[in-house]
Every structure is written in C-alpha cells, then in structure tokens.
Amino acid sequence: MNHLMSILISIFISGYHGKTTDFAKNSSCHRTTIAHFLNSGKWDDSLLSDTLKCSVIEIIYSEAARTGKSVLCIVDDTIASKTKPSSRALHPIEDAYFHQSHLKGKQDYGHQAVAVMLSCNGIVLNYAFVMYNKSISKIDIVQSIAKELPVPPVMSYFLCDCWYVSEKIINTFAQRGFHTIGALKTNRLLYPSGMKKKLRELAAELSVTHREFDLVTVKKRNYYVYRYEGNLNGIENAVVLLSYPEKHLVIPKHCVLSSVQTQPYLHRRFFPGMCVDGRLKYFPPV
C-alpha cells in the first residue's frame, strides 16, 4: 500500500507527465525497491477493486440516507488516444485498438475505457473504471456493474448518453432501484396512439402544427416541451421529452446527445433542465 501511495502522489504532483524514476522522490524506499515492486510485486487486482467499491458505496449511500438526496450512477466512456498505431510504433502498446470516436467522428487509435461514477449531494466518486477490449460489449460491462450495486435507500437515477439507453440496461438498473435518464437517438421507435413511428418523424409532425407543446421556464430561459408517455421497443410506460428553446422551435437534422454535451446536465435531475436545445431524453414516468 505504501508503494501504491507513493506512485499515486508522484503521478498527481507531476501532472501525469512524470517518469517511473520519479516514484522514489516521494518514497522512503530506494528506486530499485519500487522497480522490483512494479516488475515482480504481487497483489490481487480484484481485492483492490472490491475494497474501493465498498468504500465508495459506504460514502455515497450513507450520504443519501442522511440527506434524502438521490444517488446518481453516471456512466460514460472515453478514448485515451495514442499518436501511432501498433503497426508503426517502435514499441507496440498492449491492448490498444482502433475505436469509433463519437467526439472526433472517426476511428481513433488508443485505449478505450468505461467509467462509472456514483454521486450524491455534490459528492462524486469513481466506482469502476473498466478497460474495453472488444471481448465483451460496453452494454454487458455496464449491465454487470448494475447487477452488483446495492439497492439505494432513496429513489435514485442512472444517467447516460444515447449509447447506453438499451432495454437490458434500463431493466437491470430498474431492478436495482435506479430510474434511467438518458438521451435517445432519433431513429428510436415510439407508438403514439398505437401507431409505430420513428421519433424524428413524430418530431417533424409536431414542429409543423406546434400543438401539444408546453412552455416551461428553467433558470430564466423558456423552452417548448412535448411529453410522450407510452412504449418504446422493449420498454413499457416510458416518458420521452422533446424540448426546444422558445425562439427556435425547429427540428435539427441530427439530434443525438454526445458525451461532451451530456456532462453539463448530468448533475440535474429535474426534467426541463435535463432536456434542452432540441435534445431527446428518456425519463421514468412520474
């Protein structure tokens, strides 16, 4: 544990730009001792991970029980880009692949990871950080994490972008006491009045008539909001909100919420604040 603490402190102090030889600067041990620990030391990764998870659960769930505030389970993925693919690198990087970057809109070479955060009353802690190597889907990774979460003491929410709004994940989190709040792609099927229709088709019809929109105010800004309550494929009694700024009641051609756009809204769970600028969201029925 002392070696790990020395390594972590060195990483933070150097701003993630140091070398392994810097580890000894913050340790009472010689650098060769730390090198031996890195090369030959043995520790149980799962034990370390389980200890971290138990600590995070204890802190977040205790805060929820004390304050009555919701527990937020926040999921997102990111790519740590590398400058050269393995085919051109002098020393190939282990477990680096080409991944589709939705931020860059193209294939990106590097490590991709799925991060799961737990939050309550302003406290945000990292619960899990899982490397994605294509041997198991990101949907299955998040579902397995959902299954291991204890049922929270208060009504709680799972927050995600459109890539994780799937039947499997929503139903698994529901079983653990979490409602899902997330973005929807515009090709998702809805069933208004029992008629199957893509979300973008429904939105286009509504934008022409301007009917059934409610004008709401969030932080002194006005939005037109349309509420659909009904079925999605594999999900019963879902709520979908379409919202647009008051002066821009139009349907954008591409209406998908990216990870970057999601982050400013993740800490808000009241529905108008979660659904702005033409973004589409899934909400549990109230």
Identify the residue ranges that each predicted region occupies:
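Gly/serine-rich nucleotide phosphate-binding loop at the start of the catalytic core
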Residues: M1-L48, L52-K53
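Generic detector of isolated residues embedded in canonical secondary-structure elements
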Residues: D22, H30-T33, A115, H179, ...
